[in-house]
Amino acid sequence: MNSLQVLTKKVLIENKAFSNYHEDDVFILQQLELWWENGPIGFCKQCKMVTSGSMSCSDVDSYELDRALVKAVKKNQTDLIKLFVLWGANINYGIICAKMERTKVLCIQLGADPTFLEVGLYTMFVDLFKQQKVLLAIDIYYENIPILDSFDSHDFYALINFIYNRYILYLDEKEEMTRNTLVLKFWFKIAIEFNLIKPIRFLSKKFPHLDDWRLKMAVYLGNVDEIHHAYFQENIRLDPNHMMSLACMYPQNKLGIYYCFALGANINTALETLIRFINHEVDREITFFSNYGIWSNVHFCISLGANPYIKKIQETLLREEKNVIMKLFFKKGLLTSHSILHKKILEPGEVRKIISTYEYTETFHSFSSLRDNLR
């Protein structure tokens, strides 16, 4: 049962009773747990967002209700915990972050499953991933060493690898990452992959030391919106050829490859990088050529103007028996640049239009040429 004090706070906050306050009121509001970040606490019932002062629901610093609960639990703010649960927050998120025994007891009294810490950790991790709740996941796991340590080592890394290959997470890392850093990068990567603007901006602001890695991740995943934002609005710069080498490694990454090309990367160097990678996979006796995605990158680089008739590239293209169409195109001299890609455009929306048009026409362009040459 909620106290009269909690219910009173609920009514006052929902009716924005503290929208106009005097500086002398700040201390009192803080003592009454009616202060959030830099202003009086606010709550939007429609968006389920907790705000501060004049902050809007869409503000990068506004909190989803479950995130607000986690923060209140970490600070042992009893009335706010009760209030957020009253508004509909999931108390199981709270018990994971409770550091004091009395706070854990309160969470259980409010409906948390006392066995959740033993049986619910992996399920929650996967559920947060499915729902793309990046910021909530970071609030729960980042710097929550007891919880991270409670994961079985093998299962923890298997979980990360199951959802995502760890290769890109280790860019810029010279030694094995701590679980803490790995979790942070993992969820940051999810935000970039799905272009979750608010989480990206929030994490960029909070973790500026990851700026270069963020740009590399955006290139690798072909997120042209984030590449454009980092490159032109934040002035985060990397060598375009280095960026291109990352773009080429992600299957069917036309957006990333094109954007690096438009920034000035050498497209012949990109094709050579792909060929070296393909040959490396052959040496390791991995059946990599069945991977259409990487061969799609090869074809796209050629469409951008890369020269496929260099000896080393010829040998690779002719040796690959599984890529019959690519081999046939090569023998007939049909691997040429595509006219629609001649312009170098950097505005993300226009880039997507160009790639969309290219994808619509490339098959007809190639097979039409093949038909004419085989007559």
Swiss-Prot record:
Pfam families: ASFV_360
GO BP terms: taxis
Regions that span the bilayer: none
Family statement: Belongs to the asfivirus MGF 360 family.
General function of this protein: Plays a role in virus cell tropism, and may be required for efficient virus replication in macrophages.
Protein name: Protein MGF 360-6L
